[in-house]
UniProtKB/Swiss-Prot annotation:
ATP binds at residues 23, 26, 106, 152, 155. The gene is cca. The keyword Transport does not apply. This is CCA-adding enzyme. It is an enzyme of class 2 (transferase). It comes from the Bacteria. Keywords: ATP-binding, Magnesium, Metal-binding, Nucleotide-binding, Nucleotidyltransferase, RNA repair, RNA-binding, Transferase, tRNA processing. Mg(2+) binds at residues 36, 38. One of its GO terms (molecular function) is CCACCA tRNA nucleotidyltransferase activity. It catalyses: a tRNA precursor + 2 CTP + ATP = a tRNA with a 3' CCA end + 3 diphosphate; a tRNA with a 3' CCA end + 2 CTP + ATP = a tRNA with a 3' CCACCA end + 3 diphosphate. One of its GO terms (biological process) is tRNA surveillance. Its cofactor is Mg(2+).
Length: 376
């Protein structure tokens, strides 16, 4: 047995035909850690699963959570395309659906391998051979029916950068793009796959694959393969695993308003959008800090909101330093300036009962004096 920890002892699944499937089997065969396990149940009904204590969670097809492990158990099913888009399917889940039929509906051969409780591998579509040859290949032409598979394959290519895409699979992806299937993708799923890709070993390959099949110009027209942002992402990949930092790096050569438009289109979290816009808008100013006088430095701190949002500003300077690929004293210097500005004593201003514009001008004067003392 490979990863069936405690499998046979569970009363909830005794006498059921249960198989481990998908990424868990694939990663185990590749010697990678298994992060989550998905199971397929053959020959059972929804009523039988609930009677055993499983909690139904699937809206479109029968998926259940194990009462103890909370892992997902799905009844074996087939699917049929009835409309455009990733939701344009009807599903058939019944006791007469075989394991092989269930595996056939999966996207890639390396994800269509099942494992029995005894550790026997069931591989009707050549997944093990493709793992050996490092090939990403579709199970059947039904691959082209689900546009999400284009994103998933592009993301998987970032996780396994030494795997090639089978020519026939790439042709199917191109057909999907030409047929307009990509247009049916929802913003949330596009962002989900992009964010996951940014955290993988070679994130630039996500865009390379999308470009190869023609989807890049449709989904991300702002991003150019030959752009400085792509080159910057490539250069920082081995320096930070953070999807947040990598996202900001990728868009560092774009105008802030373009970044805002992209972020709005795909409902990118504010944390990501804010940092990317900050880097694009003020990155060049940060590089030239040594040339600034006290007035310019204070304006820089206020515009970047460095005095109030220290964590975001730290992410900003970290990103800028990665992009510039230089080791400098800039971070230390700017942090000393921030500390000095924050340490300005405002009690004398309060004692004078200064308010409004008078208070603001007096505070600015004290801050400028604090900065001048440090840089002079």
């Amino acid at each position: 047995m490979l990863v069936f920890y405690g499998f046979l002892s569970s009363r909830s699944i005794s006498h059921l035909k249960v198989y481990l499937v998908g990424g868990a089997v694939r990663d185990q065969l590749l010697g990678l850690p298994v992060k989550e396990k998905d199971w397929v149940v053959v020959g059972a009904t929804p009523e039988e699963m609930t009677a055993r204590g499983f909690k139904p969670v699937g809206k479109e097809f029968p998926v259940f959570l194990h009462p103890e492990t909370h892992e997902e158990y799905a009844l074996a099913r087939t699917e049929r395309k009835v409309a455009k888009g990733y939701k344009g399917f009807t599903f058939y889940a019944a006791p007469d659906v075989s394991l092989e039929e269930d595996l056939k509906r999966r996207d890639l051969t390396i994800n269509a391998i099942a494992e029995t409780p005894e550790g026997q591998l069931i591989d009707p579509y050549g997944g093990q051979e493709d793992l050996k040859n490092k090939v990403l290949r579709h199970v059947s032409v039904a691959f082209q029916e689900d546009p999400v598979r284009v994103l998933r394959l592009a993301r998987l290519a970032t996780k396994f950068p030494d795997f090639s895409i089978h020519p026939d699979t790439l042709e199917l992806m191109k057909k999907m793009v030409c047929a307009g299937e990509i247009d049916a993708l929802v913003p949330e799923r596009i962002w989900q796959e992009l964010n996951r890709a940014l955290g993988n070993e070679k994130p630039t390959r996500f865009f390379t694959v999308l470009n190869q099949c023609g989807a890049l110009a449709i989904l991300f027209p702002e991003i150019k393969m030959e752009g400085k942002g792509m080159a910057a992402l490539q250069s920082v990949t081995d320096k930070t695993p953070s999807p947040l930092i990598r996202f900001a790096t990728l868009q560092s050569d774009l105008p802030p308003e373009i970044i805002q438009k992209l972020a709005g289109r795909y409902r990118v979290p504010n944390e990501y959008a804010d940092l990317a816009i900050l880097v694009a808008r003020f990155g060049s100013d940060y590089v030239n800090l040594n040339r600034m006088d006290e007035t310019s430095l204070l304006n820089f701190l206020l515009k970047t909101d460095a005095l109030r949002r220290q964590e975001r500003f730290d992410q900003f300077i970290f990103t800028c330093d990665l992009i510039s690929s230089t080791t400098s004293s800039q971070p230390k210097k700017i942090k000393e300036i921030i500390k000095a500005v924050k340490s300005v004593d405002i009690k004398p201003l309060q004692e004078k009962q200064l308010k409004g514009e008078a208070f603001a001008k007096a505070l600015e004067k004290l801050r400028l004096e604090a900065i001048r003392t440090l840089i002079s």
